[in-house]
Amino acid sequence: MKIAICDDEIKYVEETKIKVKNILAEQNINAEIDLYNSSTAIYNCGKFYDIAFLDIEMEPYSGIKVAEKLKATNPYIVIFIVTSYDEYLDDAMDLNVFRYIKKPLDERRLKSGVCKALEMIDNNVITYFLKILSQKGM
């Protein structure tokens, strides 16, 4: 599992990383977590991620623009918007983000969201393999 965390405020990158690692450890899941404090770096990385936690208000690329770019690489990516702002909620929903979480992070909401995201990813993988098997006539 590959996870990206991007926020232009490094304290939120670190806080999110710690909380997500703790949740994953409770679920016995290993993940590679890449940290970004620049929207340019993640926008241009070209990497495939299963889950991304994105701040919304960043320069030069907003979290919405970064999410669009990440979805171009993996249309099944699970996007969490982590922000202090309510006014971008409609834009985020238009992009079908998975969760919109306000700062400071509510650990209970984050844990619930991450666990649901993991279930969704598992279901997508199972569906994909069943589709492959049925195409091969197995």
Name each region found by the language model.
Residues 76-86:
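A short, hydrophobic beta-strand element within the central beta-sheet of small alpha/beta folds
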Residues 7, 55-56:
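Active-site residues of response regulator receiver
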Residues 62-66:
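Acidic catalytic/metal-coordinating carboxylates
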Residues 103:
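A Lys-centered signature of the CheY-like receiver
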Residues 35-51:
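Acidic, metal-coordinating helix/loop segments flanking the phosphotransfer/catalytic sites
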Residues 59:
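The feature encodes the CheY-like receiver
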Residues 112-138:
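Conserved binding/recognition cores within well-folded domains
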